[in-house]
Amino acid sequence: MTNLNLVQKYGPWVTVTGASSGIGRAFALKLARQGFNVHITGRNQQSLADLKEQLKEQTQILIHTTIADLSTDDGIERLINDANTLDVGLLVHAAGAESHGAFNDGDINQELSLLDLNIRSTYRLAHHFSEKFVSRGKGGILLVSSLTGHFHSPYFANYASSKSYVLTLGNSLHHELKSKGVDVSVLSPGLTYTPMYENIAKDIDWSKTPMKASSPEFVVEYALKSFPRKVNIIPGTGNRISAVFGQRILPRFFGKQNESLFRKAMKAH
């Protein structure tokens, strides 16, 4: 299946969360070029306005914008209400928050807000859109998890655990909804050049790790070539190998190695 078939399969509208920057923004641009009308959502009003102008310059598609903080119930309701005015057939849920560092040093309120965004919004949106798609007899859901969600990730404990939820939910819904015409897959990117990467780089020296970052465009290109054929989509050969070893073959050893690796890579402040 090529990207062009996705509009015919699900179309005409796609809702993309986290479209202000990074992977979400790259999804919005790519899917618009493939012919989808795009419903872009995010917290940064100026970034979404800039994206809307770029989409207008490069495509002839329709664009709908929702400014919403998906870590709040009000933000989720605003997105859902706007999406209900459109014939959305595909959801790409790329919004997410990241945290890192020693578990006991984390700010509790920030960590709980992370869980609201990464877990609560994922549940709410997956529930709403899957119900809508089952009713219309077709639809697609692509949830964005993380490579860290596939294995033990010391110093990323809360973030990785939240992404494990996304991974498990997506895989479970894949099997549950397939017979009802709804495709569900999970994208688990490794290290990617996004604002999230820049935030982590303030505290972690990536040169002391074997991890190599990919561009958001590479991640999105691979994802759309794989969706919906693959349930678990992991861009990058090295990342796929890491997921297999960390999740299935040597999980405890992998976790121990990650603890040593990131403890040494953490910058002193």
Predicted regions and their residues:
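Conserved glycine-rich cofactor-binding loop
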Residues: 13, 18-22
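Conserved NAD(P)H cofactor-binding loop of Rossmann-fold oxidoreductase domains
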Residues: 94-99
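Substrate-binding pocket helix/loop in short-chain dehydrogenase/reductase
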Residues: 102-115
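Active-site helix of classical SDR
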Residues: 126, 162
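Residue(s) in the substrate-gating loop at a strand-loop-helix junction
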Residues: 146
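C-terminal helical subdomain
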Residues: 186, 207-243
